[in-house]
Regions:
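Short catalytic micro-motifs in class I SAM-dependent methyltransferases
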Residues: 113-114
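A short glycine-rich, Lys/Arg-flanked "PGG" loop and its adjoining helix->strand segment in the class I
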Residues: 124-136
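A conserved beta-strand element that flanks and buttresses the S-adenosyl-L-methionine
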Residues: 110
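ABC ATPase nucleotide-binding domain "signature" loop
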Residues: 117
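Class I (Rossmann-like) S-adenosyl-L-methionine-dependent methyltransferase catalytic domain
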Residues: 1-43, 50-101, 121-125, 139-207
């Protein structure tokens, strides 16, 4: 996989700026309502933290957060909000999903429109790390891209049929699985979107 020059702007700045005032996603909001405020370990991971909206929302809800993104601009934005939350812990990592050795245990793993950007050659290992990090009773919340998405021809990204996407959650409790297919805007202009919005829980009795 070709690596980007870390000193060259990524082109994501306009996207981050556009989303600066956006509230947390409805999907993450729905997931947070399902987690007890008295959860014994309020550790969350934000995979592909981007503009930082969901990281901020998690901090506001009292979660300790590990925010991960390959883009330096994203991590700089997230680091800038740290001072506003002295009572919780925020850790940031500038890192590609493909290079993750492991993930720490977490009660909530959020991956907002980010997991499909893992290279297919590394996806199986990465997904195993995500599942292994999820504590019993913990929630995964995020999106996968479907195989009818306009970007599905990009060999550097990972796409799934609905059956394949559902199969990734075998052994987990699927709380919500919604398929969305529509034409709409993207960072590169209008495109056909095909995605799956997922909330899944690791069973509390899972070893």
């Amino acid at each position: 996989m070709q690596r980007r020059d870390p000193d060259r702007p990524s082109g994501w700045e306009a996207y981050y700026a556009h989303h600066t005032e956006r509230p947390i996603s409805l999907l993450l909001g729905a997931a947070l309502k399902r987690l007890s405020p008295q959860a014994s370990r309020r550790q969350a991971i934000d995979l592909g933290c981007g503009s930082g909206n969901e990281t901020r929302g998690l901090l506001e809800a009292g979660w300790d957060v590990i925010a991960i993104d390959q883009e330096r601009e994203a991590i700089e934005r997230v680091n800038a909000i740290r001072a506003g939350f002295p009572g919780v812990c925020l850790e940031t990592r500038t890192q590609q999903f493909e290079s993750l050795a492991t993930l720490p245990a977490a009660s909530l793993i959020h991956a907002g429109m980010s997991i499909p950007f893992c290279h297919p050659r590394h996806f199986e290992k990465f997904w195993a790390q995500v599942r292994a990090a999820l504590l019993p009773g913990g929630l995964f919340v995020g999106q996968l891209f479907g195989n009818r998405d306009d970007w599905a021809g990009d060999p550097s990204r990972t796409f799934h049929s609905e059956a394949q996407a559902r199969g990734l959650f075998q052994g987990l409790d699927l709380i919500s699985f919604e398929a969305h297919e529509y034409d709409g805007p993207s960072l590169r202009g209008s495109k056909h979107w095909h995605r799956f919005d997922v909330i899944a829980r690791r069973p509390a009795s899972h070893a």
